[in-house]
Amino acid sequence: MKPGIHPDYREVVFQDMSNGFKFITRSTIQTRETIDHEGKTYPLAKIEVSSESHSFYTGQQKIMDTAGRVEKFKNKFGARASGKVAK
């Protein structure tokens, strides 16, 4: 591989924010946060869903609206979404 053109491929801790589950894998993701895990310091990437919380893997259906997506959509597109056109 050519030096200097590839991103840094390193071990990163991914943390599922819905249940706190953490796992280490290698990634090129850029993060500002770090975490101490098993005696070492790793970059931390926070994710909303992982295999520990996704309904496909857990077998439990769960409604997740952690970011308030519906309200955010209504605030942004309220008049247009209801069929009314503002003039």
Curated annotation (Swiss-Prot):
GO (cellular component) term, any one: ribonucleoprotein complex
UniProt keyword annotations, A-Z: Ribonucleoprotein, Ribosomal protein
Entry's Gene Ontology BP terms: translation
InterPro entries hit by this protein: Ribosomal_bL28/bL31-like_sf, Ribosomal_bL31, Ribosomal_bL31_B, Ribosomal_bL31_sf
Disulfide bonds: none
Record keyword Isomerase present: no
UniProt-recorded Gene Ontology molecular function terms: structural constituent of ribosome
Record bears the keyword Ribosomal protein: yes
Listed Pfam families: Ribosomal_L31
Subunit structure: Part of the 50S ribosomal subunit.
Family: Belongs to the bacterial ribosomal protein bL31 family. Type B subfamily.
Record's protein name: Large ribosomal subunit protein bL31B
Source organism (scientific name): Burkholderia vietnamiensis (strain G4 / LMG 22486)
